[in-house]
Regions:
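Beta-strand-rich binding/interaction modules
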Residues: 466-467, 781-785, 790-810, 861-865
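Contiguous beta-strand segments within globular domains
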Residues: 758-796, 800, 829-833, 892, ...
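Mature extracytoplasmic or organellar-lumen-exposed domains after removal of signal/transit peptides
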Residues: 868, 877, 910-1022
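Glycine-centered tight-turn motifs at strand-turn-strand junctions
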Residues: 91, 806-853
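Beta-propeller blade termini and top-face loops
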Residues: 23-769, 776-786
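Short acidic/polar inter-strand loop motif in beta-rich domains
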Residues: 840-844, 867-875
């Protein structure tokens, strides 16, 4: 479809549009400026992998999210504020340290050292010199993962960093690094080999020249984790890192190979060192002679389990026998020097890191898979987690309800459904989130037409959970519900990934598809299944073995490989299915699985994970795919398009950074050339079918965007981030209407999307109350300007109904506005939100001007006209009723007319009061100049009567807030109560509303008659 034809369909002036899709360029940032991402939430925590505190400020702490940036609290965890969105270009923060000698200086290391199969890497070290207000990059970007930072207690420019390295492949930027100039330059001072990095690092509490470093040989692939090898070991330096000694073979140490190691020391015993060592015969080891000899103190599995995911130790600075080991079972604590450990509760689960105030050891912070939690009493009580929007979602689905809902599974949380706007309040409160499944991974898909029924995939048995939110019934379905824990993928009847795809057919709602090594289909809502494809993977048995070795086996479905990882169904052709595998294959069937064709793009590297396939909404043979290979140390984006059912593919990555892996690609549902792509660090848009890409980041934090969904009716974009929860971009119509001609015009008005007459408001500060942000309740009007208007050539927006009656006018010149001043008039894209209210074109006293704002209009067709100079542009839009509202058009019309009548009376009262003020002033002057007593007495009586009329019309102003409890309210105030009663709901006004209005109207007429009588006396007296 040509852009010219699409413009006609949308009612846009053809002369202002480019001639063809291909002519759409990369647009300047100002052309997107007025768009804004809206945080939905949840505020229920998320994975935190780095924590620290400020010794001198006991209530100040910092936390680093797994892909959520840096957060700060100054009230011991009651509230958290992000301090890194201003500056950091990555979200994974794995190390934090505050300079002991200057609490304003903070170093942050990026990348995750708790090497989950889904971990996110970083870009080195960042530094703040103003307590987190601003940040600058401080080097080591090639390391990708910084596990620990240690700062010289006397010199904040002297810093050591433990660099784990690439994790997914060998690289030389590993080991321990040192800077003496605050990060301007770095020197590698400990290096083993390209497969081994530094995972922990401590400084002796009594001597900054003494360092202990844990080196870890680690490699991850999509199909395997290898934790440990000959490169792993424990090292010591006694001269600030100039020379190192390998302690791994000292007396009492376990035999190798070693895996991950955690280290701790206490100022209370300067010669004592603790080490938690992953090894055959590993456990907690202690040296009381500076590392010369060692003794194993503890070896039970509650400390040594899943070493790659835990293995940190912390010692109390005041009590060397008091030791902490964050673990899955809780915060493991020893009070006898490591001989025994007991679990202590802390908020959250899967605890990873902690910081203990060295001067007040009862004050501590713990980071875990639920967030950051603080204790000020030694772990007796802990701060809340539900104030941190750090959720890691894998996917997002939307339904067709109003408002539409979002669905997704949160890592280390559960699977949730949430509304995109809360029409009962000012934000999306925590009680708007509803759990629909217990799984922390995978897809959550609502049934078309029955969104109260969801299907969610997850678990280690490839289960599919069906949940009915009406009846609260759940059913666990699946082709082969056998627990796979501890088994290699090669032994399974069905291989499935941790995040296996779940797809409900758009053509047959009870048809469900799953991706295992083959495609599974159920025609009866999951009760029975059949294989509709052969094994579509490469089926390399060497990549289907147990993971975790050579020391600790870790067999979960996270590393299961050779599986179908992406499914897509054509919305245009029943039976046309696409399948992509995690080992780099793409398949197509046009007969619902009877025959499959290998349509793998020739340029797609082997073993790439095909994470998303998008079937076109406009052409059956067109599809896009997004693939990634960052877990093989290849961070390039892989996006492809085919227009002939996969016979030919074109790579489409121009404009994307070459180090941002691609997760998802989606097509707009109305503009065939408009595409969206989610990457490792953000989101991009293409306006020409993928030929060129540009950032659509706007105010979105830099974090991985794992999935994108276009909600057609709302013209909204919903995204799942892997560290900052759900976000929505409301009203993407401006993206559809952008064009060269629109940008070159002096002004260009875009077509407003349908607005909804509903309740609920937007509080821009909702996040302060741990709530998601509502959209503005009104009509969003977008317009482009080449330059800002001035008072000589003001810009105005006028709103009229279908009969041409003016409802409101806003102008950049306040004197020409019937409502508030139009102050959104800058070069580039602007957004104005009309509140859908009638605004009377009257000028009243400031304290009375509020009555000029009338009721919200009724559903119907409206126009907005933009005027500047001699140019006038008009667009038509609709306002629809909330479909949940039972009111009829006649009900809403009756409500509107009543409220307009009340408003008319309120305006009359306001103008009457203004007139009385003028009359008072005149009488006061006459009284001062009157020569006879009789005249002065008459004027005094008139002034008194005017005061009585004023008091009857409106309660006198007072500095006392509760003065209204001491005197009757006026007619104006009582009319306000009726306005509130009739206007708060979108229903037919109650009989009482009408009766009270009529009674008050009659009272006003009585007072008006009294005023007329006084004025007649004054006229006669003259």
């Amino acid at each position: 479809m040509s852009r010219r034809f699409l413009a006609c369909v949308l009612g846009i002036a053809v002369s202002l549009l480019p001639l063809a899709l291909a002519s759409k360029p990369v647009y300047p940032d100002a052309s997107l400026r007025a768009l804004s991402w809206r945080l939905i939430g949840p505020f229920r925590g998320g994975r935190v992998i780095a924590v620290t505190g400020v010794t001198q400020q006991p209530s100040t702490f910092y936390a680093g999210g797994a892909d959520g940036g840096i957060w700060k609290t100054t009230d011991a965890g009651h509230d958290w504020q992000n301090v890194s969105d201003c500056c950091l270009k990555v979200g994974a923060v794995g190390a934090l340290a505050v300079a002991p000698s200057d609490p304003n200086i903070i170093y942050a290391g990026t990348g995750e050292s708790f090497t989950r199969g889904d971990m996110t890497t970083g870009d080195g070290i960042w530094k703040s010199a103003d307590a987190g207000k601003t940040w600058t990059h401080a080097g080591l970007d090639a390391t990708r993962v910084i596990a620990k930072i240690v700062i010289d207690p006397h010199n904040p420019a002297h810093v050591y960093a433990a660099a784990l390295g690439h994790v997914f492949g060998p690289n030389p930027e590993r080991g321990v690094f040192e800077t003496t100039d605050g990060g301007t330059t770095w020197r590698r001072i400990l290096y083993v080999d390209n497969n081994t990095g530094a995972v922990d690092l401590i400084m002796a509490p009594d001597n900054p020249e003494v360092l202990y470093a844990a080196m870890w040989q680690i490699e991850r692939k999509p199909w395997h984790l290898e934790s440990g090898g000959p490169g792993s070991g424990l090292y010591k330096s006694s001269d600030g890192g100039a020379h190192w000694t390998d302690l791994s073979h000292e007396s009492g140490m376990p035999s190798g190979p070693f895996g991950k190691i955690g280290i701790a020391a206490s100022a209370a015993a300067p010669h004592r060192v603790y080490a938690l060592i992953e090894a055959h015969g590993g456990g907690v080891f202690r040296s009381d002679d500076d590392g010369t000899t060692w003794q194993r103190m503890y070896h039970k599995a509650n400390i040594t389990q899943r070493a790659f995911y835990f293995s940190r130790l912390y010692a109390d600075a005041h009590d060397a026998n008091h030791l902490y080991a964050p673990q899955a079972a809780g915060l493991m604590i020893s009070t006898d020097g490591g001989k025994t450990f007991k679990s202590r509760y802390a908020q959250g689960g899967d605890h990873h890191v902690m910081w203990i105030n060295p001067e007040h050891p009862e004050m501590m912070i713990v980071g875990n898979d639920g967030g950051a939690t603080i204790s000020l009493d030694g772990g007796i009580s802990w701060s809340r987690l539900d104030n941190q929007p750090l959720a890691q979602f894998y996917h997002v689905a939307v339904d067709d309800q109003f408002p539409f809902h979002l669905y997704g599974a949160q890592q280390d949380g559960a699977t949730f459904e949430v509304t995109s706007r809360d029409t009962t309040g000012y934000g999306i409160d925590p009680d708007a989130w509803h759990m629909v499944a217990q799984w922390e991974d995978g897809y959550a898909v609502p049934m078309p037409g029955q969104p109260w029924i969801t299907y969610t995939g997850g678990g280690v048995a490839g289960l599919l959970e069906r949940y009915d939110s009406h009846t609260h019934q759940k059913a666990f379905l699946g082709p082969w519900p056998e627990d796979a824990t501890g088994h290699p993928a090669a032994e399974l009847k069905y291989r499935f990934q941790w995040v296996f795809p779940v797809m409900i057919s758009q053509h047959a709602p009870h048809a469900i598809y799953l991706g295992y090594q083959c495609v599974m289909k159920s025609a009866d809502g999951g009760m029975s299944w059949q294989e509709i494809s052969p094994d579509l993977t490469r089926n390399d048995k060497s990549k289907q073995q147990l993971s975790g070795g050579p020391i600790t086996i870790d067999a979960t479905s996270v590393e299961y490989y050779d599986t179908v990882f992406a499914l897509a169904e054509s919305p245009l052709a029943k039976g046309l299915l696409w399948a992509g595998t995690d080992d780099g294959k793409v398949w197509l069937t046009r007969d619902d699985g009877k025959h499959w064709h290998d349509v793998t793009p020739p340029g797609l590297p082997a073993w790439a994970t095909v994470s998303t396939i998008e079937a076109s909404h406009f052409k059956t043979g067109t599809a896009w795919l997004a693939a990634r290979r960052y877990r093989q140390d290849d961070y390039a984006p892989y996006l492809y398009v085919t227009h002939d059912y996969g016979q030919h593919w074109q790579k489409i990555v121009h404009g994307l950074p070459d180090d941002e892996s691609s997760f998802v690609i989606r097509q707009d549902t109305r503009d065939p050339a408009l595409l969206f792509a989610g990457t490792l660090r953000g989101i991009y848009a293409s306006f020409n079918g993928g030929d060129d890409w540009q950032p659509l980041q706007l105010n979105l934090p830099h974090t991985a965007v794992r999935d994108i969904a276009v909600q057609a009716r709302a013209s909204a974009l919903a995204i799942a981030t892997h560290g900052r929860g759900f976000w929505v971009l409301d009203d993407i119509e401006p993206l559809r209407e952008l064009s060269n001609a629109a940008l070159q015009a002096n002004a260009f008005l875009m077509t407003p999307q349908t607005a909804w007459l509903t309740d609920g408001q937007q509080d821009p500060d909702a996040a302060r109350y741990h709530s998601g942000l509502n959209p503005p309740n009104g009509v969003s009007v977008f317009y482009l300007l080449r330059q800002a208007p001035d008072d000589a050539t003001p810009l105005s927006l006028s709103f009229t109904d279908s009969r041409g009656k003016l409802l409101a006018r806003y102008s950049s010149n306040a004197a020409k506005s019937s409502g508030m001043r139009l102050d959104v008039a800058k070069p580039g894209l602007n957004r104005f939100v009309w509140d859908m209210r009638y605004h009377a074109d009257v000028t009243l006293q400031p304290d009375e001007q509020v009555v000029a704002t009338g009721p919200r209009v009724v559903p119907g067709t409206y126009q907005v006209t933009l005027s500047i100079d001699d140019q006038h542009m008009t667009r038509t839009f609709n306002i629809d009723k909330d479909p949940r509202n039972p009111s009829t058009p006649a009900d809403l019309e009756a409500r509107y007319l009543l409220l307009r009548d009340i408003q008319d009376d309120q305006i009359k009262i306001a103008t009457t009061l203004q007139h009385i003020d003028v009359l008072r002033s005149r009488l006061a002057k006459l009284q001062s100049s009157a020569s006879d007593v009789a005249s002065r007495e008459r004027i005094t009586r008139w002034l008194s009567e005017l005061d009585q009329i004023s008091a009857a019309l409106e309660e006198p102003a007072s500095d006392a807030y509760l003065v209204g409890l001491q005197q009757p309210s006026g007619i104006q105030d009582r009319l306000g109560t009726v306005t509130f009663a009739a206007g708060e709901s979108l229903l037919r006004p109650a009989t009482g509303d009408i009766q009270v209005w009529k009674a008050l109207k009659a009272e006003f007429e009585v007072q008006s008659a009294k005023l007329q009588g006084i004025e007649e006396e004054i006229r006669v007296d003259k």
